[in-house]
Structure formats: structure tokens, C-alpha cells
Amino acid sequence: MASLGSTIVSPVAKVTIINRREFVRAAAGTAMFARFTGAFPSAASFDLIIRGGRVIDPSLRLDGVRDLAIAGGRIAAVESDLKAGATDTIDARGKIVVPGLIDIHTHAARAKDGPAICLADGVTGFIDAGSQGADRIEDVVAITRSAAQPARALVNIGRAGILPEGDTMDISRADVGAARAALEKHRDILVGVKARLSRDVAGSNDYEVLRRAQEIVTPLNLPVMIHMGQTMSPLARLFPLLKPGDIVTHMFAPPPNSIIDDNGRILPEVLAARRRGVWFDVGHGRTGHLRWDIVERVLQAGFWPDTFSTDWTVEGRTAGVVDFPNVLSKFLDFGMTVNDLIARATVNPSRVFEVFHDRGTLNVGAPADVAILELRPGSYDFVDNYKNVRTGSQRLFPAGTVLGGKRIPRA
């Protein structure tokens, strides 16, 4: 895990606040990237220059029109009006240029073309979050390993994976030995356990499922991602089992057992979990995981997500998710800025899983993974998981992807 400290976001200042350990680590990373600068041409020819875009990089606290130069698969320069040539040029005038998006909750490895579809939408790193359990994990591992972009997967604690009748309604399916064996066999790809705890998935077994998940990962120093929302057990019982580095996805799920009470207060167990380093993730999804009134109340209470994710599936592209930029767009009319959104889709998720530790930034020397977005004004109907509609005045659209310094064609 990249960090055991949670990112705390101030709803007033709207800036990312990192703790001392993260600051020292970030400073060391900057020094490391600085050592690359001598390897790049200063005014000669680069491999690729993305010219004239509004470059937003929360890791650098950068928001301004810049030219972005790439050489040898890495960021070589970020400058105003760069006086240099390049083998290839992208005209990004009128567009937003950001680090490649990192989606930590997808089901991209359920389909062979899933990684490529994500990549064309600007997602240059993803986690497949529990599409399969130990019995059927080989296909997920193979698709994840073959992805062009950095990708990893979580094994579902239910050994048969996602089931219509509920992954762990039969508690014997939460097989500690089988999941641990899968993790140990595929340590290069499997980076944690997914535990779905909703009442239609685990029933009254939710506490025991989470306890077993921790039994699996704790000796391996790996995280658990919990799928919360409408659990049988109260969060006051479940959340004390969460350790630093674990992830709570579907944080905007409505009652029963939401993270916010009827009086608009975030539950104390939720606040305590964040303080000890648990990450809170959007996990948009298709069914039951996000409702506009809960989003509004939670954000008004000052409890902002650490990370955005889609819970992406091929089927979800025709429903409320569509793509990662669309999910981000839904939060613009809740008082979050474009910079707020980009931070939670780039630098913040880069801290959650070690595979992304050098991503989520456009610092010189970093891998040249870039998403180009277009922010279009207009009237857009955004749908939650309950078919409620909110009309927004702006939407982000994917307009280009660069992975390792190479252009990726749009799907």
C-alpha cells in the first residue's frame, strides 16, 4: 500500500492536505524526478508536445496554460510557450490536460476489451475490484496482466465471485484458504480482497465476511475494499474492523446504514475510520450505490470523497456511469471544482495502491500518462442509481489519451 495516511480534504479551502510522512515522501519523489531532467533535450526535438492546453495537476498545484513535452515515455518539460520541435504534436487549445486518470473500482477485467475501452476514455490505470473469486480468478488475472495500462485486481472473498443470489449468503463461500492461495499465487496482480457486505450479497453474514477478509490480508499487508450500503449490521459494528489503508467504496449509498444519520451528521465511527487512514471512495455503479440526496447531505456535512471511481462495467456504459469523466462531471454542481475532481482521480488514488505510486502527476520524469478532457457548457441530465435526475450546466468529455508517451486512438 502506498500510504497509511488518509487524505483529508478541507471543504472550505478545497485543497488536499497531506500529513508529514506524505510530504517527505512527495519531496523525495520530486527530487527523484528532478534527476531525470538532464536526460531530456531542453530546446531540441521531443517525441511529443501537447500544446496550449489548460494543464491541471493538483500534485504540482498547477492550473494554467502550458505546453507539455514528452521524451522517452516520460514527461520532459511543462512550460509556457515551449520553443522546441517534436516528432508529433497535439493541439490542446481549449481543452484540459491532466495526469492520466486512475480508477480504483472497475470491473474492466470482466471483458477482454474492458482495459482498452477504459484507456480510450483517459483511464491510464485501474483496479478490477473483485469481479471474480478464487475459483475463477485466472481469467481476471490474464486480462489484467495483458492490459496496456498499469492494472491490478482484488480477489472477491466469495470464492465463486459475484453471484445473483449473493456472493456470501452461504458463509462457506467466504473461504479464507482459497482466497489466500490465490493472492499468494498471483502476488504480481492481486493486491487485496473485495468484500461485498450489502444485505442482498452477504445477508446477516456481513460481519463475519469482513472479519475473514481481514484474516486473509493482514499477514500479507494488503488492503480490504468493502462494498457498503444497506448492510444488515450497523456501521458502528463493522467499521472498527477496518484498518489503515482499507477502502470504503459506495460511500454515498442511502440507508439503511448510511454513513450519515437523520440529523445530517457523519457517524462517529466513519470519522474515526478516516482519521486512522481508511480511504473513502465514490464507486458510482449502477444499482443502489449512489443517491443524489445522500450525496448532497454528505458533502454539505464536509465529508468529501478521497477518490472517485466508476464501478465500471460494459453494461454500465449505457446507464448512469457512461465513462469516468461523466462520473466526475456529476459533482460539479455540488460545489466541487474541476481541480477538486482531478485531484481525486489522479494524485489521491496514486497513494492508495502501490502500483500507481509514480503516476497521477505530470512532474518532470514521471511516466507520460496523460488524459485530455473537454469541458463543455450546456444542459446535461445526470442520473443517480435510483433514476433521479439532476440537471448540470457543464460536462467533461474524454478528448484524448497518451500512455507512456504514445497516443491512444479513441474507441
Regions found by a protein language model. Name each.
Residues 116-198:
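Divalent-metal coordination cores built from histidine and acidic residues
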Residues 53, 367-411:
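C-terminal cap of metal-dependent C-N hydrolases
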Residues 293-377:
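His/Asp/Glu-enriched, well-ordered alpha-helical/loop segment
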Residues 129, 195-298, 302-318:
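Active-site core of metal-dependent hydrolases
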Residues 19-34:
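N-terminal export leaders
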Residues 95-117:
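Di-metal (Zn2+ and/or Mg2+/Mn2+) metal-binding site signature of metallo-dependent hydrolases
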Residues 32, 38-49, 55-99:
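Histidine-rich, glycine-flanked metal-binding segment
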Residues 1-19:
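N-terminal secretory signal peptides
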